[in-house]
Structures are given as C-alpha cells and as structure tokens.
C-alpha cells in the first residue's frame, strides 16, 4: 500500500517530535556535565601528581563517552587511561599502572580485560561514580599496538574530531537509549550487542538517528560499512563496520546474529508505529513459578537445569566459557539420541553465592532401554565376521545390513548429565567449578529463584 506525501510528512513530524522530546530527557544537564568534567579533571590531576611522586613515567587522559560527550544522563561511566611509554615492559605496565591507579582511590576492585585494570568508586557531589583506570601503552601508530586497549585513544581522537560541536552527540544518545531498551547495548559477552564506539560510528555514517534506523531496517546479513573506504577485514559476521583507525578490525565483531536481527526488527517497528515507549526502560519483571509451569505445560517440552557456583572471573570470560560449555553439553545430549529444542545460560545472583545455570529444553528427554546398532553389509564378509565376533546374537538383517539391539546406557537426560557432564569441553574456569560440585535436575525439581524467572522471561520472549 502506497503512502501519500501528506502521510509521510505527518509520520516524519511525529518521529522528529518524539526524538526531540527523548533527547531532552536523556541529555545530561549542565550540572551533571560540570560534575563529570570536574571529577574527571580531579582524578587526572591526582594521577599525574602521584606519578611524579612515585617516579613513574606516565600521564593520564580521559577517553570514552564522557570525553566525547555522548553519554546518556545518569549513565556516566568515566574511563581514564594511564599512558606509559612504548618501551615500558608488560610487567612494569601492570605493576606500576595498577599501583598508580590504586593510589588515587580508597575503594576499588581489580578487573581483567587484555590486561588488568582498576574499577574504582568515587564519591563526588553527593553521588557515586564508577571509573575505570586503565594502564596502556602510548603507541604512536594504531597499526603498532602492544595491547588491545592501546587503540582506544585513537578512537577518542577520531570521534572527537568529527563529532564535537556537530550536534550529532544527541543522535548518538538516542541510539544508545534505543538499543538499551531492547537489551542490545554493550559489547560484553552477556549481551553481544552494540558498543558505544560502534554507535558513534553508525551516527557518523548516517548523520542522524532516524536516517540510521531507515537504513538498518533494510540491512542484510553481512552488511558492510567502511567510513574511510580502506577496509581490509574479510570476516563473516552479521555486521561489519571497519574501524577507521584499524582497517583490519571489525568494530561490530561482538554483535551477535540475535542482536543484529533484534535491531532490524526494532527499527522497522519504531518507524512504522513511533512511540515514546521505545525509549522507556522497563523494570524487568520475572516470571513467577506458576507462570513458568503454565507455559511449560502448554509447550509440552521438558527442561533440564545444570547449576553450579559461578567461577570468580570477569563477566566476559565467564559468559564466553558458559556458552562454550552449553554447546559442548548440547552435543553430548544429542550424541545420546535425545533431542534439544533450545538452550541458554545465565548467572543467578539471587542466591547466597552467584550460581551459573545452563538450561536445556528438550523435545525428547526419555528413551527406550534398547537401541538399534547398524552393522556392515552382509556382502562385506570380512567386516561382517568382525561384527558378529564383537556382538552377541540375535543378529537381524535390515536393508542388507546386520543389525543388533544393544542396551542403552542412559535412558533419560538427567542421568546422562549427572554421569557424563565432566567429559564435556567446558573451559578452564567452568571445568574447575564443576569439579567442586554441581546439580542436575528437571526444572520442576529445582529452586525457582528470581534469577530463573528473569531468564525465562527473556527466553520466552516476554521482555
């Protein structure tokens, strides 16, 4: 059905009005901007002063969304990089960088990306700010990185030169808020969505949030964006966005097929039926146990749950290994003739200690005590004799081949996983956690916590 010019203009007006109203809600006010700037400058000054006191050759700079003025109000995660000369050894970078970072904060925790950094907490102007203090090498050329984080200052410079004062900062905020409301903002393993830097590049490419959505609504698998036209990356991902400062890198490598598809669908929905609701973060409401039981009964499937204490590693490593374990366990289940419909992983923080959980939904979860074992063709005499020597009669013949019926070792999925889970390829940290103890049960027999309810809300598509 064709849309008249009048209707198109009316729709465009509504879209612009909604976006302008949302911008007013999510743009940091003057007070918030002044606080973030003051705190950032204070930390940088303290770091530089401490570096002199401690005899450390390093200086601090501000990077990320607060440096580029693209953060959403109330979401100011401050990133400060501590720049060391390129000739610094990896050991000195780690030891001196962490010592310097710890010296400016009373409350912090050590985290790990490509190398350790400090996640600090600062009380400032009656609120608490979270700040990442990241040691890196001050490389002169992004093609000569010594660690993955070394390219971030180049990202900073690239975006600031093209975004600052352009008026596009608010368009970036709109995109971030939109993605956040669909649970696909952030490149960490838990989400596998769109990073802040990727959002900035997409707006630089399309010049407005609405223009971006109109293009995204038409995306196909393998969509390729190369702002500088110098890309050398040849991977196979749903979305490829060449890094302007590193032509061999895909900025969108972390974006999963789900996140890619979710964005396309959300873009089409918003453009067709624009509403403020697309920008409203909703408090996640977990499914109750009774709701879950009703839905599960209607589906007619069975759910098996594997639970164990979550390894104490950074979230990205944890979820990467959980997904690896999920794939391996799923293969074990299917090798034993059970049929997996869907599966997923989560971490339940609604317990005394964080629990890692793998969930498997099954179409076939119980099997007969016997199974058919197909042998060689009767005409292959040498192989046939070996087969008959190895197995016990009776020998059946079907379609010209010998067949024997053998006793199935596991007739239900729970007994299989209780006995064979450790044989799976689980990843270093998950394997160690499994060794310390795990629980396998049907979902109806397990503890139904808030965390489980939140997982199934998303699993069933009710988010």
Q: Model-predicted segments: where are they?
A:
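Conserved catalytic core of two-metal-ion nucleotidyltransferases
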Residues: 47, 95-146, 333, 339-358
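Short, polar/flexible loop-turn hinges at active-site or ligand-entry regions and domain interfaces
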Residues: 86-90, 107-108, 162-166, 187
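Short amphipathic alpha-helices in soluble, non-transmembrane regions
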Residues: 94-100, 372-377
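Conserved nucleotidyltransferase catalytic core and NTase-mimicking acidic/glycine-rich helix/loop elements
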Residues: 167-353, 365-370
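Extended, charged low-complexity segments
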Residues: 346-463
């Amino acid at each position: 059905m064709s849309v008249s010019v009048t209707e198109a203009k009316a729709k465009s007006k509504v879209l612009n009005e909604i976006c302008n109203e949302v911008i007013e809600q999510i743009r940091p006010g003057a007070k918030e901007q002044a606080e973030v700037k003051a705190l950032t400058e204070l930390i940088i000054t303290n770091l530089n002063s401490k570096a002199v006191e401690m005899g450390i050759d390093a200086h601090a700079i501000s990077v990320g969304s607060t440096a580029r003025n693209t953060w959403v109000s109330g979401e100011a995660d401050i990133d400060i990089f501590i720049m060391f000369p390129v000739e610094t050894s990896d050991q000195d970078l780690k030891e001196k960088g962490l010592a310097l970072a710890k010296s400016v904060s009373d409350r912090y925790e050590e985290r790990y990306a490509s190398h350790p950094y400090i996640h600090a907490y600062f009380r400032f102007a009656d609120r608490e700010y979270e700040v990442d203090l990241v040691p890196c090498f001050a490389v002169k050329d992004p093609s000569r990185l010594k660690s993955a984080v070394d390219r971030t200052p180049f990202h900073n410079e690239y975006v600031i030169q093209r975004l600052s004062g352009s008026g596009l900062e608010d368009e970036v905020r709109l995109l971030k808020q939109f993605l956040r409301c669909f649970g696909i903002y952030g490149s960490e393993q838990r989400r596998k969505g769109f990073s802040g830097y990727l959002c900035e590049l997409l707006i630089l490419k399309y010049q407005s949030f609405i223009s971006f959505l109109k293009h995204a609504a038409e995306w196909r698998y393998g969509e390729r964006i190369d702002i500088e036209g110098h890309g050398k990356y040849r991977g196979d991902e749903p979305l490829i966005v060449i890094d302007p400062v590193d032509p061999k890198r895909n900025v969108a490598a972390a974006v999963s097929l789900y996140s890619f598809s979710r964005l396309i669908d959300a873009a089409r929905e918003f453009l067709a039926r624009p509403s403020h609701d697309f920008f409203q973060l909703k408090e996640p409401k977990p499914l109750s146990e009774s709701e879950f039981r009703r839905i599960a009964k209607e589906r007619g499937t069975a759910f098996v749950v594997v639970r164990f204490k979550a390894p104490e590693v950074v979230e990205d490593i944890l979820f990467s290994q959980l997904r690896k374990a999920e794939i391996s366990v799923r293969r074990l289940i299917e090798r034993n003739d059970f049929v997996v419909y869907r599966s997923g992983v989560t971490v339940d923080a609604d317990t005394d200690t964080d629990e890692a959980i793998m969930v498997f939904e099954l179409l076939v979860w119980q099997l007969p005590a016997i199974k058919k074992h197909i042998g060689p063709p009767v005409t292959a005499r040498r192989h046939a004799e070996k087969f008959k020597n190895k197995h016990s009669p009776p020998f059946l013949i079907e379609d010209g081949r010998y067949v024997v019926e053998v006793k199935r070792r596991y007739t239900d999925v729970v007994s299989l996983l209780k006995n064979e889970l450790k044989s799976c390829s689980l990843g270093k940290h998950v394997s160690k956690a499994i060794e310390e103890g795990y629980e396998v049960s049907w979902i109806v027999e397990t503890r139904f916590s808030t965390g489980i309810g939140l997982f199934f809300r998303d699993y069933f598509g009710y988010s």
